[in-house]
């Protein structure tokens, strides 16, 4: 925890010493700090009690702004509600909210964006959208079951959406088998390496 606190102080000190808006790198470092703080908290952490005893910090890919993508966005109205597969027999209800299209490393790619039907009833999450995805790093430098990105609903009439892979995080199942986690649909399998966001857990901790 001391290491996490030191990291936050460095970020805040740098930001306070300049009149400028915090840099993109500082923004992502703060996201990483908040995630590490959550995982170090015995009341909020998905880690097993045994892993929590030795937990210091999650491992991340280097921050790379090239993985902050401004994608074209297409709404998909009136798409059917469906049961998303999970790592257990739980089948949460989702609807495809839209499609994001972008180019990365010379490849034309697309990701479906989903809306959880239960969460949308909660005012706190009414604009929450979910992007589960797989990429070619899964099973090696990243978790084999894929990773997730959360975004806010684009403003009405928007034709673009920002997808920041530096904010990609692991399902709780990557840390503890007691959880039930959505499995990324096959349409969200990217044929590129996403060298951004959280790395696989358990290889170097």
Predicted regions and their residues:
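Extended, aromatic/histidine-rich regions of cofactor-dependent oxidoreductases associated
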Residues: 21, 25, 168-205
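A mature extracytoplasmic/lumenal domain signature
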Residues: 73, 113-117, 135-137, 165-169, ...
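Short, surface-exposed linear segments at secondary-structure transitions and domain or protein termini
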Residues: 118-126, 151-160, 202
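Intrinsic-disorder/low-complexity, polar/charged segments enriched in Ser/Thr/Lys/Arg/Asp/Glu/Gln
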Residues: 66-68, 97-99, 160-162, 189
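Mid-length scaffold segments of soluble, non-membrane domains
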Residues: 77-145
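Bacterial Sec-dependent N-terminal signal peptides
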Residues: 1-23
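Acidic, glycine-rich flexible loop segments
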Residues: 130-169
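Start-of-domain marker
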Residues: 20-78
